[in-house]
């Protein structure tokens, strides 16, 4: 599907926020889009839905390589080729005490989730290396705690330390971010016997479940199996995942 | 206008097929395109027992292509018959089943099991390792190709297609071995063996070290091999490798492929197979060609 870029701006060093027109299906929080980044890239690239309202889609992305670099140079009026929304998204359980945990650009899918989560009480913990971004958009949606590794903004340390402190006060944790963070969320939530859903990343080709390229290892009754991050995920119950 | 072609006993509405392993069992793509429009569907390679496949990463993008190391993840032949075939049977499209054995006996076992209603053809994937011969692919040895083809031919009433690997010195010898073994058709090419290195870790990207290259990067190689094969066999050839649009498809047909298969392009654009069919039709209209068979093998050298 073709989508017209409405805006594309840098919001931190190498982090961009892009909005485009969206006439396709309404996304569910945690779902992602496959975007043709043009230039020399061959496959489409996956990006989470960061926000969505009335035919306007927002993504938040970090420049990593050729594809994201091309994206960062797009301007209002440029046309993107996109498929999606793909994947399962977060399972929303209404009326719970919820903790949303994001690390770095992994906070991308969590804004739309925070808007749709229908919590009884919502805590949001956002962890960054040094520079923070998008925090203001979370303010007002819940009780926000920010961490940076050196303490330049907010609390000093890792976001998972916040989770350790708060785990006793919540019914469910939703997380997205770097693998070590997700692994820590899995450990903390399993130890505390609290529900936890995490959004995983893997290299993708088709994005729809056909190529079996995006495998992630999950626990089975006897041993393990590989599931598809794009179709069976990207969101998994933390206890299923074998890191 | 006639777009239909014949491969063995299979009548295809048009010459556009999906390549094994790039179209799953059709389910995912049925959300994007009308499967009834396709010439045929070749499903993911099956093995006797379910296979988990390789650990990630399994994909790596290269210049104009992808390297994959999926490791033949599949539910096994029984689960396919039970869970996937009924879905495929609900469409009016020939189903061709790709089989990958580790021994000749495994190929025969699967061919017998799949000799059932709802399946039109068997595609023998000889690119998998021959465990009895120390893991070298069956497909590099013409004697093995002949032997498997002959035994599978005896084991099934379906159209037998032998899928050749390009990772050989002389593809013509392999094609002739398949024809001699009784194949109804030959398909080529499978992926080209390749490798990628992570310079930070100084390790291969894939745990398996070697992966299979597909996509536009391999199209010239594929086209040349199809050209070579059509000159030495009289059975139909299904051409594939890097087809991204109707023009690519026409190149293969002009060279002499009776049908073409689209693989990696499905990942980039899930609508591509139908777009290719429409593109071929338009080309025929514009050039006042009544029958697709006028195009096939029409290359002037
Ligand atoms: C479901 C899902 C949702 C995602 N959502 C976002 C998002 O909202 N914002 C965002 O900035 N990024 C997101 N990503 C990661 C993003 O897809 C990659 O950063 C992007 O594909 C890199 O493309 P590139 O061409 O710029 O870099 P490449 O040149 O392809 O790669 C540069 C680096 O990025 C890594 N990379 C490449 N593809 C992926 C991938 N699929 N997942 C993780 N790392 C990858 C490579 O290993 C390499 O280190 C998501 C990934 C997935 C799987
Ligand atoms: C992800 C992936 C999985 C594949 N799996 C199989 C398979 O199971 N059996 C097989 O015979 N070929 C398999 N192939 C090879 C393709 O069917 C095809 O021969 C090859 O990719 C060349 O065509 P393409 O460039 O259009 O993709 C696979 C290719 C890819 C990219
Ligand atoms: S990206 Fe193809 S199966 Fe997930």
UniProtKB/Swiss-Prot annotation, chain B:
EC number: 1.3.1.14
Record field: catalytic activity: (S)-dihydroorotate + NAD(+) = orotate + NADH + H(+)
Active site: 128 (nucleophile)
Family: Belongs to the dihydroorotate dehydrogenase family. Type 1 subfamily.
GO molecular function, one term: dihydroorotate dehydrogenase (NAD+) activity
Source organism of this protein record: Caldanaerobacter subterraneus subsp. tengcongensis (strain DSM 15242 / JCM 11007 / NBRC 100824 / MB4)
Gene name tied to this protein: pyrD
One BP term from GO: 'de novo' pyrimidine nucleobase biosynthetic process
Pfam families (UniProt xref): DHO_dh (PF01180)
Cofactor binding notes: Binds 1 FMN per subunit.
UniProt keywords, alphabetically: Cytoplasm, Flavoprotein, FMN, NAD, Oxidoreductase, Pyrimidine biosynthesis
Main location: cytoplasm
Quaternary structure note: Heterotetramer of 2 PyrK and 2 PyrD type B subunits.
Positions that bind substrate: 44, 68-72, 125, 190-191
Subcellular localization: Cytoplasm
Gene3D superfamilies: Aldolase class I (3.20.20.70)
Protein name per UniProt: Dihydroorotate dehydrogenase B (NAD(+)), catalytic subunit
Coiled-coil residue windows: none
